[in-house]
Every structure is written in structure tokens, then in C-alpha cells.
């Protein structure tokens, strides 16, 4: 959807190799979940096959359709309740600009406190990722 100016906000970490069906089954998400939520927050509706073979349609054209949240129960159930065959998703417009910031901290606690302070001031970053020394060394190897 990028050529049309839209994107799928949950941004699963495995986005290069995953499928929407897998995202729905696992309730996947990545670094953007802090601001935009997980897959369950972007699934408007599904067509699914129940274990007995019945075809069901859950959800509707808007998020938070009235009634029991069977859709919410299905998303993330890892295929134990049904197999999703179609999904209607909420897409977001791509932002006009993106700013990336890299900051170093003396400890994980200090980094966590900085993130808390930023969010406490009403700024919710689109994504936050943290790597400790061991992870950085592994990534650089």
C-alpha cells in the first residue's frame, strides 16, 4: 500500500517474511505498537473457518463494532478457534516525515526513565527500541 500513501501500523518485526494471516493468528506487532497498538487494534473484520467447517464472518466496517468481541478473541488465538481466510484491515496514511533519534544511556534503567519522561510529557513516539550492550555486540558481529 506504500505506493498509495498507506501503511500497516503494527509493523511486525518479521514483516519481510510474514503474512497477514500469520499476523492475525499471532496478534503480531513490532516497534510501532507503542503508539498504534497490535494487530488486534487494526483488524476490522475476518472471514474464518471454524473447526467444524462452518464459515463465519466477524467484525464489521468499523473498529469496535457492537456486541461480543468474538473478533478480539479470534485474533491471537493461533488458529485454535478458527482459520482466518480473509481479513479487513485498518490502514494508516504514511506520515509526511520521519525523524530517527539514537540516544545512548549509562544503564537500562536510565533509558527506561527517559522513555517514561518523554511519554509523560504527552509525546508518544511512533516506535521505541532498546538494545543492551550484549545485543549491540551480537548485532555488530
Name what the model sees in each region:
Residues 1-131:
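FAD-binding subdomain of flavoenzyme oxidoreductases
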Residues 129-141:
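Glycine-/charge-enriched secondary-structure boundary and capping motifs
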Amino acid at each position: 500500500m506504500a505506493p498509495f500513501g498507506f501503511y500497516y501500523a503494527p509493523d511486525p518485526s518479521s514483516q519481510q517474511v510474514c503474512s497477514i494471516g500469520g499476523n492475525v493468528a499471532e496478534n503480531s506487532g513490532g516497534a510501532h505498537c507503542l503508539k498504534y497498538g497490535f494487530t488486534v487494534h487494526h483488524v476490522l473484520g475476518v472471514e474464518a473457518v471454524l473447526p467444524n467447517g462452518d464459515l463465519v464472518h466477524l467484525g464489521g466496517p468499523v473498529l469496535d463494532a457492537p456486541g461480543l468481541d468474538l473478533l478480539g478473541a479470534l485474533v491471537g488465538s493461533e488458529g485454535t478457534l478458527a482459520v482466518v481466510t480473509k481479513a479487513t484491515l485498518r490502514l494508516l496514511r504514511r506520515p509526511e516525515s520521519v525523524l530517527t533519534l539514537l540516544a545512548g544511556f549509562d544503564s537500562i534503567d536510565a533509558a527506561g526513565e527517559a522513555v517514561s519522561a518523554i511519554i509523560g510529557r504527552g509525546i508518544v513516539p511512533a516506535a521505541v527500541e532498546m538494545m543492551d550492550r550484549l545485543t549491540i555486540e551480537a548485532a555488530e558481529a
